[in-house]
Amino acid sequence: MAASVDFKTYVDQACRAAEEFVNIYYETMDKRRRALTRLYLDKATLIWNGNAVSGQEALNEFFEMLPSSEFQVNVLDCQPVHEQATQSQTTVLVVTCGTVKFDGNKQRYFNQNFLLTAQATSNSTVWKIASDCFRFQDWAN
């Protein structure tokens, strides 16, 4: 977080980035899954219902084996992660909740959280997934 930017501005920027990211992520997951790994860092880790997948090749194989999906995000929360916790790397925590229907399966509730890091390119900043944790949610009896 740059010293010249007040915290509220920093939070607002993080929220705008998170909203844009969520739209891109779930549209890509549902419609262009082969491109999904482009949103991840090379050494990113996905935890899918307790199962870890790391690295671009393994992520690509994992996403290819999933049935087609229809995600509906109902809740989005985000917050910047303090730079002291991330060695001055601009990082945002994004949490989503909603429903998903995988082809051949019933609709289920899900919760997913992402740690996004800002990656500078020659003319802009691109947000990449460093960590992704997906869980199906079941109601407690």
Swiss-Prot record:
Residue intervals of the NTF2 domain: 17-136
SUPFAM superfamilies noted in UniProt: NTF2-like (SSF54427)
Domain of life: Eukaryota
Keywords of the record: Cytoplasm, mRNA transport, Nucleus, Protein transport, Transport
Subcellular compartments: Nucleus; Cytoplasm
GO cellular component, one term: nucleus
A biological process from GO: protein transport
Quaternary structure and partners: Associates with NXF1, NXF2, NXF3 and NXF5.
Function, in words: Regulator of protein export for NES-containing proteins. Also plays a role in mRNA nuclear export.
Name of the protein described by the UniProt record: NTF2-related export protein 2
UniProt lineage: Eukaryota, Metazoa, Chordata, Craniata, Vertebrata
